[in-house]
């Protein structure tokens, strides 16, 4: 892949091309205002807030981060934009592939397409934040407007409220600076890869600046037939009051995506559909394959089993944010208000291996069933929906001393309103046939060859599997939608207490009142909906002790909790304690039995910051205990398994 970067100077400013250094921030953390962002001197009393070459610590963008990373008794990794750029990352998933302890799931198990990170083995899709504010919707997040990504491992409900036991992700966006600079980066590669990213910052006055990032991205998928991904986005922002005690930042983010989604290669068989093999499961059907009927052929890794004329994924994100800050004394008061609206709809083909069509089945050959194997059912997974949120956070943070003891504190409140709506599209895909692949479904292109699938098959949607009437692909009726709403009121506080230069105590406490309302879809417009409303009061806390052998090293021990109430994801993910499983009537669930899933994390570790804080080393051992653990069984019922425990060790190297 070829990458070209063209720098330029905005407004005919004279001087060298400027880029924002790692950890740079444009606003001060506390009065008197710091001016490191615009190049002036910083006094000695403020140097504890500085990481690199007199530049402000990026923790200023997350008020709850009351200590530098080396003094934080948690396993925390920060990816600056330099690392994101140098690794060629274009999405959140790309960027996090470089971080140990994080894997990504796909749209399996009923999850919608979108980012699904697993941190320390726990699904953390509901614990993603942008500038410290929850970003719940299922989506594939871009990085063109990202300045850094912060990963906190371990139980984290003290930081963000309801959340997973594994940890959380916080995306820090680019913001205006008192400077003139800009760049255009163009990338080209195989599979018709084309990407252009622009970043322009204009200093409007000695206290105001405007910044805008833009994206255009178009590519096929290397090594896969027919697939493509296209998207564009823009992210303008303006700040007034830079370098003064009072600052206002208004920002907007828009991303539009269009893609032909891919769900991969089918498995050959499972125990349920391959009797006599003695195998519980097998690997993907790739390479030379022999079916139960004796047919031998070659399955190429590039095979795409979907339909180019049917499958699609369209998504848009609109996000508007207003942030106001004021410094007084050694404290900063900040209010952040954000409105977010996300839309997503898709049809993607799951190359289904559950019906015995791939390997073959002993099912009775009735109705023209193809039982000898060598076929793939093009199961259509469909979804449309949107999510909205309006969240307001108020934070007071800063430093002060009580005698010989120094405090770095953050206290705040959060009020959130969230809702999601989701339904399905009316698509005929042969679901009524068993086994799925028959002469009829093959003739209608709802099944295809395992060895030679054709994405350009002339598939047509019919009113039903038995109808010959052509029908448009439309949304199913609104009364069939699943509806979720939530309200949250929170209060929290953090204190990093420097007892001595070598000993630091870190404390945090949070209370959340989380009310959720869930309503399943119904069969007719006249059928009344069943409404489930519940309120959970969640108390979470954390405590840690840090010992510093040297200023650049630390050894720590910590304890933290997390709480995941039912319906925590509002249907934007597949939950083992979701109030509504799939689309069935929630009245079939005993609401009182859905207890809050609670976790406790114990962690010990050591950190070192080397070479002028350009290289960070971390080693941590952890144990996570889960109470009220549960899973979804094969019959789509919630099964309680009591307690669960996970232990692990992590080693990380992070630098620039």
Task: Please give the residue ranges for each predicted region.
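Transmembrane beta-strands of outer-membrane beta-barrel pores
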Residues: 186-192, 216-220, 254-258, 328-330, ...
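Face-selective signature of the C-terminal outer-membrane beta-barrel domain
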Residues: 322-340, 379-519
